[in-house]
Design a protein with these regions (language model features):
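Sensor-1/coupling segment of RecA-like P-loop NTPase cores
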Residues: 47-52, 58, 105-109, 133-141, ...
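Mid-core helix/loop region of P-loop NTP-binding domains shared across ATPases and GTPases
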Residues: 82, 98-141, 150-154, 191-196, ...
Length: 275
């Protein structure tokens, strides 16, 4: 609705995890570098945690882009599956055509695929999002996948993404073997006020028809209100930013001030009281 008015090619605050819109704060850049290091050095297990909306999924998309074509990747977005369903999902994500099999059949297929990848001098990476939703048994199943190896190296690098509950779950005695195998751990916090401002400007620049001459501007008062309401959580910044642009369109102004930001925040709070 407001794209044409503000001369935007696309909506700047869409909540889909598009790496083009990824703004790397210092902590996001550090986390990405740690993930890349762990995978490229074949460290086996990697764990990234953060509160809801801090950018874990978007960071995983950036990770996939950074890895390049020499890495075969499988991304599991909904890991609430049985052991057999999880193995089938992993095999399918790696692009291996398969008919319905039992657990051992999928495991054999996965092992064959990983050996072929390894013999070609390439690597395979499994990324599991929302890993905190997995049962202890499912996490143990994932641990067993790390036993797929040659005499020299692991065949599969595994990256677990999840909310802070994942860390608490991994601390359980029955998962101590898995916890001991995690060699790289990262945690994402919410952004501070300065990063919130830079984040807003970055997304507007990416979406603008003319990035050097933006037709809409969030003034310092608006940025303070957005930070106060969102607490620096990217997902909430996106939600209030989108509604603030809509308010600017309604009031026919390209200057988003604290009043419009408060209007946007109030609308969001009314629609989603838990926001």
């Amino acid at each position: 609705m407001y794209k044409q008015y503000f001369r935007l090619r696309e909506e700047p605050f869409n909540i889909t995890p598009d790496p083009r819109f990824l703004y790397l704060t210092a902590q996001h850049r550090e986390a990405l570098n740690h993930l890349l290091y762990g995978i490229r050095q074949r460290k086996g297990f990697i764990c990234l945690t953060g509160e809801v909306g801090t950018g874990k999924t978007t960071l995983s998309r950036a990770l996939l882009r950074e890895l390049g074509e020499t890495f075969h990747t499988a991304l599991i977005l909904n890991p609430v599956l049985t052991d057999t369903q999880l193995l089938r999902a992993i095999v399918t994500e790696f692009g291996v055509e398969t008919k319905r099999r039992d657990r051992l059949g999928y495991l054999s297929l996965l092992n064959e695929f990983l050996l072929k990848v390894n013999s070609a001098g390439q690597d395979a990476v499994l990324i599991i999002d929302e890993a905190q939703t997995m049962t202890v048994d499912s996490l143990e199943q994932v641990r067993l996948l790390s036993n797929l190896e040659t005499e020299r190296q692991k065949l599969l690098q595994i990256c677990l993404l999840g909310q802070p509950e994942l860390r608490r779950k991994l601390a359980k005695p029955e998962l101590r073997q898995l916890a001991q195998r995690i060699t790289v751990r990262c945690h994402l916090d919410n952004m501070d006020a300065q990063d919130t401002e830079a984040y807003l400007r970055h997304r507007l620049s990416v979406a603008a028809e003319s990035p050097d001459t933006p037709s809409v501007h969030f003034d310092p008062g608006a940025i303070r209100e957005i930070y106060r309401f969102s607490g620096g959580t990217p997902r909430l910044i996106n939600a209030i930013g989108d509604k603030a642009l809509l308010a600017g369109y309604v009031y026919q102004t390209g200057q988003i001030d604290d009043r419009l930001a408060r209007i946007a925040a109030a609308e969001l709070e009314e629609a989603c009281p838990s926001a």
